[in-house]
Design a protein with these regions (language model features):
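Class I (Rossmann-like) S-adenosyl-L-methionine-dependent methyltransferase catalytic domain
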Residues: 1-55, 60-62, 66, 70-77, ...
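Generic recognition of short, well-ordered alpha-helical segments
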Residues: 79, 141-145
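A short acidic, Gly/Pro-enriched loop at the edge of an enzyme's catalytic core
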Residues: 119-128
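A short SAM/SAH-binding and catalytic strip from SAM-dependent methyltransferases
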Residues: 127-141
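A short glycine-rich, Lys/Arg-flanked "PGG" loop and its adjoining helix->strand segment in the class I
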Residues: 144-156
């Protein structure tokens, strides 16, 4: 693992300790997650992703999920597929995921290196899913490297569904500000004492975007055909890619 991978691991380990539920789904109130709603939204997001990209999971599928976090989507995928390989860069997230999903006997939890799918054999999976993960990766090069890896691990005829940002204006960190006055100052002070989220000004949260032409060129080199792209030029671009024979 290089320095970039180490930084991502350290960042997401810190966020897992701080409030894993909020950082996996920022709609959850920091420090006060509604766990039932959190898991329900995971199922809804799997359904929405598959519906928008016109995809269907088969009970015989071996699914690889990149960036599983707490296993919010993993839980649903495990119910619908034969086997799930759930990968995350953060050992803290993986530990929590296993604690919250200890009944998922068809899931293999794997610690990733933040850059590759090392350890996953060539042409060994039917489906790759990665949702709201690339958006937080600071390097477009790393994102495109993962696309190349998708082409390597997918069986011919297999498919990948993933989200990434194609909006260059969506990844600008706000500069550090002086302690504000009034109610904003109270929020600033809450962050100082651990009552508000931290780290959202760091590159590992701010993330980066990928030009569509670079995505297309990388996919072609990896043996992937980009069958469908929804939401181009936005922070939430959905991609369906087919592994060609």
């Amino acid at each position: 693992m290089d320095d970039a991978g180490e930084r991502m691991r350290d960042f997401w380990d810190d966020r897992a300790r701080e409030d894993a539920f909020h950082f996996v789904d920022p709609r959850e109130t920091f420090g006060q997650p509604d766990e039932e709603r959190f898991w329900r939204r995971g199922a809804q997001e799997v359904d929405a992703l598959l519906e928008l990209l016109d995809l269907t999971l088969l009970k015989s599928d071996h699914v690889l999920e990149l960036g599983c976090g707490l296993g919010r989507l993993t839980r649903v995928l495990a119910q619908r597929a034969q086997h799930v390989t759930a990968i995350d860069v953060s050992p803290e997230m993986l530990m929590l995921a296993q604690d919250h999903n200890d009944g998922l006997y068809n899931v293999e939890w794997v610690l990733g290196d933040g850059e590759t799918l090392a350890g996953v054999e060539d042409a060994s999976v039917d489906v790759v899913i990665s949702h709201s993960v690339f958006t937080h990766i600071p390097s477009p090069k790393v994102q495109l490297g993962y696309v190349t890896e998708f082409g390597r691990v997918l069986k011919p005829g297999g498919w990948a569904a993933f989200t990434l940002s194609t909006d260059p204006g969506a990844h600008k960190a706000k500069p550090p500000a002086a302690p504000p006055a009034g109610s904003s100052r109270r929020g600033f002070l809450r962050a100082l004492v651990g009552q508000a989220p931290t780290g959202k000004d760091q590159p590992e949260w701010v993330g980066s975007w990928v030009p569509l032409d670079a995505l297309g060129a990388t996919a072609t080199q990896a043996g992937l055909f980009l069958e469908r792209i929804e939401g181009s030029s936005t922070r939430r671009t959905l991609v369906r890619a087919l592994r060609e024979d």
